[in-house]
């Protein structure tokens, strides 16, 4: 969207609020950044702009989707970067801005390393594609948006991207813009929960939600970048079920754990949900021809791709990453996340972006659809009231999930027969057996009886027994 003056832009924006919000990207506020230079725009193809988007252009692209599909979208921010740029999210849902009980929440995050630019652009293209196809009545996309709350964050590191994009010429330095403006590698900056869970595996301790009730500690930690803190709060505040973090520099779908148990540089380190994570990674790689090609040569001559299988890898088997976002999601919340490396080049020429879109379009859709697998349902008391933070345990898998505020839960699983137990403080636990197909998710609801209700019930039974005995024996 080109700027043509205030009045014309007001018409294009469609509302004063949208116009003011969009113009805010170009203004230097008190202590605010210069957002980045504008460039001549390329024409769209099928409603998608196959080009790099600097910060103002990224905002324009998201606003354009929002205005085009206003009934099923909204834009919000989870915070600001170190230099003050907003960490923007486009949400797509039939009821935007609201968590609908029983509807799972999904997120994509791109551009965590600012110089890894393909993921940033693919997520902008994805937002445009979903909006366009929804309006065309594409049944797959309509069903996806109506039954999933989708959150798309094109750039977690907008400062790093601006630095990388400011380099002259098509050949970009391998490291310029990787870190945030403070020089912090965001994918080494999250609390190292792997080390905690590895200790708990040996000595006993919780296997999930390891940051429960510790938000203040996150805020007070001066070693955490503002981008990291913003995403931690986002993860903790929304009941995400599934996520992918888009990177560049190779071609592979990477799954937990990312950090080795022994501390070695390379070692397969499976998490309790290794089976479903392998399946999730394949759901992405199998639709990407270059990624899943068994004969694809390594991106660089000396690269070690020996851990790659069908375009997937266990993260720690490839190389150990402490403090990564992927494992943080799994160990701090109910969210299962993989990391996808999209391109051998980190900042490839602009004319190649359309090819990357064609390689990844079906994978991006397929991966969102994986959220509708396994088991889902509600945990309530006998009066039908939701029980939040109930624990859902699967026999044989040492990783629990918890119910959200409406009592709703989602548990991703590969096909098979399982024993699922729901429990909550003050309630009697209930176990149920369930046969899980590949998809869709099987609904299993739980009604838990409180200890106080059980005591009253036992008291009434005792009184009835005493009354019967009294009448029988003529007391």
UniProtKB/Swiss-Prot annotation:
Its cofactor is Zn(2+). Keywords: Carboxypeptidase, Cleavage on pair of basic residues, Cytoplasmic vesicle, Glycoprotein, Hydrolase, Membrane, Metal-binding, Metalloprotease, Protease, Secreted, Signal, Zinc, Zymogen. One of its GO terms (biological process) is Wnt signaling pathway. The keyword tRNA-binding does not apply. Its EC number is 3.4.17.10. SMART domains: Zn_pept. Glycans are attached at residues 138, 389. The keyword Zinc applies. The active site is at 341 (proton donor/acceptor). It is found in: Cytoplasmic vesicle, Secretory vesicle; Cytoplasmic vesicle, Secretory vesicle membrane; Secreted. Sorting receptor that directs prohormones to the regulated secretory pathway. Also acts as a prohormone processing enzyme in neuro/endocrine cells, removing dibasic residues from the C-terminal end of peptide hormone precursors after initial endoprotease cleavage. This is Carboxypeptidase E.
């Amino acid at each position: 969207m080109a700027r043509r003056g205030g009045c014309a832009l007001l018409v294009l924006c469609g509302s004063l609020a949208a116009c003011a919000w969009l113009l805010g990207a170009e203004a230097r506020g008190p202590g605010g950044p210069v957002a980045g230079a504008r460039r001549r725009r390329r024409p769209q193809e099928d409603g998608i702009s196959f080009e790099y988007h600097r910060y103002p252009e990224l905002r324009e692209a998201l606003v354009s989707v929002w205005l085009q599909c206003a009934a099923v979208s909204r834009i919000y921010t989870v915070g600001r970067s170190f230099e003050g740029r907003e960490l923007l999210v486009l949400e797509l849902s039939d009821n935007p801005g609201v968590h609908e009980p029983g509807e799972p929440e999904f997120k994509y995050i791109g551009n965590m390393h600012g110089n890894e630019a393909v993921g940033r652009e693919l997520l902008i293209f994805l937002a445009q594609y979903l909006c366009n196809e929804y309006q065309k009545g594409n049944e797959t996309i309509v069903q996806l948006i109506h039954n999933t709350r989708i959150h798309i964050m094109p750039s977690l590191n907008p400062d790093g991207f601006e630095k990388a994009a400011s380099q002259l010429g098509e050949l970009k330095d391998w490291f310029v813009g990787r870190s945030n403006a403070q020089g912090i590698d965001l994918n080494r900056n999250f609390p190292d929960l792997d080390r905690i869970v590895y200790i708990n595996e040996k000595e006993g301790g919780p296997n999930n939600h390891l940051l429960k009730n510790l938000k203040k500690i996150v805020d007070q930690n001066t070693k955490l970048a503002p981008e990291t803190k913003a995403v931690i709060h986002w993860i903790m505040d929304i009941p995400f079920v599934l996520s992918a973090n888009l990177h560049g520099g190779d071609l592979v779908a990477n799954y937990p754990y990312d950090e080795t148990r022994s501390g070695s540089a390379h070692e397969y380190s499976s998490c309790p949900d290794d089976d479903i994570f392998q399946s999730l990674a394949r759901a992405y790689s199998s639709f990407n021809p270059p990624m899943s090609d068994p004969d694809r040569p390594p991106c660089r001559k000396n690269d070690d791709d020996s851990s790659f299988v069908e375009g997937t890898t266990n993260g720690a088997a490839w190389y150990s990453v402490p403090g990564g976002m992927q494992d943080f999601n799994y160990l701090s919340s109910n969210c299962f996340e993989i990391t996808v490396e999209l391109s051998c080049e980190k900042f490839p020429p602009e004319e190649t972006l359309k090819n990357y879109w064609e390689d990844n379009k079906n994978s991006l859709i397929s991966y969102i659809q994986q959220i509708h697998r396994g088991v889902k349902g509600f945990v309530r008391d006998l009066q039908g009231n939701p029980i939040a933070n109930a624990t859902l345990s699967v026999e044989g898998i040492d990783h629990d999930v918890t119910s959200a505020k409406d009592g709703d839960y989602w548990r991703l699983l590969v096909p098979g027969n399982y024993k699922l137990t729901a429990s909550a403080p003050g309630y009697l636990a209930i176990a149920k057996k369930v046969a899980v197909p590949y998809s869709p998710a099987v609904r299993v609801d739980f009604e838990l009886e409180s200890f106080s209700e059980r005591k009253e019930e036992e008291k009434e039974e005792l009184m009835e027994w005493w009354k019967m005995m009294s009448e029988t024996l003529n007391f």
